[in-house]
A protein has these predicted regions:
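Residue-level preference for the first positions of well-ordered beta-strands
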Residues: 67-69, 112, 137-143, 171
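A cross-family acyltransferase "interaction/gating" segment
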Residues: 102-104, 152-228, 232-233, 244-248
């Protein structure tokens, strides 16, 4: 562990203490009807503070959604903070995230809807929770790849959590996330995938000078109520944002 990583880890932990007090004085005592929105707002207020610990900066394009469904690619444990720093949101995440140090704690307190994919009946319960969150006017973020990747490609989207989208009646947006490191390889040192283990990965990332995120947003026009076809169309929409960014980057380099 280098000095930068050690110092930032201490700073991160101190910020966690501040965040706990912030939660106790805001979202913890919200009414049942407003608690989900209050938790999303709490994470929104605190995300940027924690991202700064990583030397984090961002570039944003497109219309930032405020409600409805947001469908995004998934790269890292930073994704929830990165999106939440831009707009208050309720996240849908795999149950494993609950066990991540610190970030799992953030996820639980912010009202994340956890899914246990090995339990087939649990998907229906999760879709019901998504509908409840949407009914409150929340923005619900889904990562339909089902896992995080190294940003080389976007995995085919799973259809199980797209039932609320297929039913219609909700605004749908798509987003694409991308990270860059000034002094490293973002695909292995920011993206959290494969055989990486959490704490060594986090310490290494804290030791980097800075992390740069790109977030691209776009509205999605739903033209089908078939989940499989919808999954393909949403995948194509997110992939299009990735390809647009690569074209812009290439043009800039020229």
């Amino acid at each position: 562990m280098n000095f930068r990583a050690a110092g930032r880890l201490v700073l991160f932990c101190l910020k966690v203490v501040v965040t706990i007090f912030s939660y106790l004085f805001t979202a913890a005592f919200a009414s049942k009807e407003t608690k989900r929105l209050a938790r999303a707002a709490w994470l929104h207020r605190n995300s940027r503070r924690h991202l700064k610990t990583f030397g984090y900066t961002e570039g944003i394009s497109g219309e930032i959604p405020k409600r409805g469904l947001l469908i995004s690619n998934h790269l890292s444990y930073l994704d929830i903070l990165a999106i939440s720093a831009v707009t208050p949101a309720v996240f849908v995440s795999k149950a494993d995230v609950r066990r991540w140090p610190l970030f799992g704690w953030f996820a639980k307190l912010s009202g994340t809807i956890f899914i246990e994919r090995e339990r087939r009946l649990h998907v229906g319960e999760v879709n019901t929770e998504i509908e409840k969150a949407l009914a409150t006017g929340a923005l619900v973020v889904i990562f339909p790849e089902g896992t995080s990747t190294n940003d080389e490609t976007i995995l085919p989207f799973r259809t199980s959590l797209l039932e609320p989208a297929a039913r219609g009646g909700h605004e749908i947006s798509v987003s694409w996330l991308h990270y860059e490191l000034e002094d490293g390889d973002a695909r292995n040192e920011v993206c959290y995938w494969g055989d990486h283990t959490f704490f060594p990965h986090l310490l290494n990332l804290l030791g980097k000078r800075s992390v740069r995120a790109t977030l691209r947003f776009a509205k999605f026009k739903q033209i089908t109520d078939d989940r499989k076809e919808l999954a393909k169309q949403l995948h194509a929409a997110v992939l299009n944002l990735k390809c647009e960014n690569e074209v812009l980057t290439a043009d800039y380099a020229d």
